[in-house]
Structures are given as structure tokens and as C-alpha cells.
Amino acid sequence: IEKVAQLSPSCVIWNGDASNTEETIEAQMRIYLQPKIERKDYAARLPYLFCPGNHDERGMANRHLERIWMYRQQDERPSRDWDLGRNFAVRMGDIAMVGLDTGEDKLDADKRFAGLFNNEAYRVAQAEWLRDALQQPEIASAPFLVAFCHIPLYDPRPNLNPGDVLPEDAGDKYTADYAGWQRTCAQLWTPMLEQAGCQIIITAHQHRYRYDAPDETRPWAQIVGGGPIMGFVGEGEKRREAPDRFPTVIEGSVKDGRLQVVVHNCVTGLVQDSFSYAARKVKKVKPPPRPLPR
């Protein structure tokens, strides 16, 4: 919060896992509206946008997050997409920002969910919304396109669970029984983002900062933001330093016609990394005609 206040950005994207299996609206209020922090101007002067994480899907209260965190207005999208209020496509200056919800980190058929989730259809519905959102004049004409979602859409490690395999079918191939990255979402969404010229996708979930540069398999970069651990793991005698575990604030701005991205390490207070991206090729899009006055 202090770093965000220091940077004083035009808006803030909160990239998920703010909560964990919340059952009451009072618990949500303590997290989102009345957090126990020293700064009392939290979210009072800066607009916040929220990309839910997998933990924000769990619990009775989290099924109705809109009671605390206002969903996008229905009049900005067709009736087909009214239930997709957690998605956003907005523009700040020369930067278009798209927010997607990767949902849970396990398959709907996973026995642990007892049939309570329908994320697979939800992700497909978001693909339909994304196709239209990328064609909106204010989005299509922006020199820079940045996408946000909680679970990464790429990972270089072959033994990391891609989220589309049931535990009983995985055998010993993967190191965990939950998704470390989201292959299904990548297959649904990234072809459209690539076609639109998206320069970077900013994700979270893994609790360790990582940068995935563009390569021959994908033209977009990916930043995996750090987690909540402040440089140490373990307790008591087992407590040890973990310099690779730190929260991050990822700052974006346009300078000299390029998108400048700076990754701030919230443990050291130093800049962890910085990157620069050229503008994408955009088509001049004519705004839709205004309706005639009645």
C-alpha cells in the first residue's frame, strides 16, 4: 500500500487472492473495505480494478463478490455477457487493459469441489466476451495492450500441473494436484490476445516473481508477480531467509512512445526488474454512430 501511494498511479489492478473461503459479508468487508492497515486513504483516492484469484472463488460469500466489489455495469456489454461482471476492458491514456478470471485451480470434476463449480463453461464464455472487447474502438486503437489474470497462462516447467488433469489421472507426472498454470485458459484466450498484438500478460498465483520473455512459441511477455511472503519462510528454529519470496508492485507507464514496466521488490524497496515494449500496430477504428435523438 505504501509503494502504491508513493507511485500515485492513475489506477490499481489487484491481481487476486485477496481472500480465502469467505462465508460472510462481514469477513469480506474486513478484507476489502476496512483492512487493518495504517493508511486510511486505502482505495479512497485511486480507482481499483480487481482480477479474482482461485481463493476468491471459495466460500458462500465469495460467490456473490459483487455485494462488496461492484461488478462492471451491464450497459457496457450485451446481455449475453451480463454475468461476466468480473471481466473488464478499459483504457487509461495509451494503455488498454483487459482483466480475465482464470477461476479455480482444479477441474470442475475434482471430487474436492463436490460439483459446486462450473469454471469450464465460464472460461469459454469469457472467450466470447474477450473477442468483442478487443474490438471496442477505445481498446483496438490503443498503442499498448496489457492483459491481467491471476493464474499464469504459460510456464516453462514440464512438471508443473497445467490445470486440466484430474489427480487420479496425473500419476507422478506433476509436482502438485492443483494448477500451477492454466493451459485451458491459454488455449482459449491467448490466440485472440496475440492477434490483437498484446505486449504483456501480468499474472500471479505462484508466489514467486518470474519474467517470461517472448520467444518463438509466443510473441507476448508474461510477468508472474510475487506473493505475500516477506523474504522469510518457516517459523521458530526453522525460519530461514528466502530472497526469492517477496511481494511485488508492477508499475506501467508510457514514456517516449514506449510502454515502460518496472517491477518493485517490496522487501528490499528496490527495483527488481524493468522492461520496455514498442507500440503495437493498430487499426484506425471508427467509433460507432451516435443514436439519433428521439
Put a short name on every predicted segment:
Residues 12-14, 50-51, 147, 202:
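Residue-level marker for buried hydrophobic side chains located in beta-strands
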Residues 23-140, 166-180, 188-194, 200, ...:
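Extended active-site neighborhood of metal-dependent phosphoesterases/phosphodiesterases
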Residues 1-26:
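N-terminal active-site segment of His-dependent metallophosphoesterases
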Residues 15, 137-158:
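Short acidic, glycine-rich surface-loop motifs adjacent to enzyme active sites
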Residues 16-17, 53-54, 150, 204-205:
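Active-site glycine-centered loops adjacent to acidic/histidine catalytic or metal-binding residues
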Residues 10, 143-145, 199:
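Conserved acidic residues
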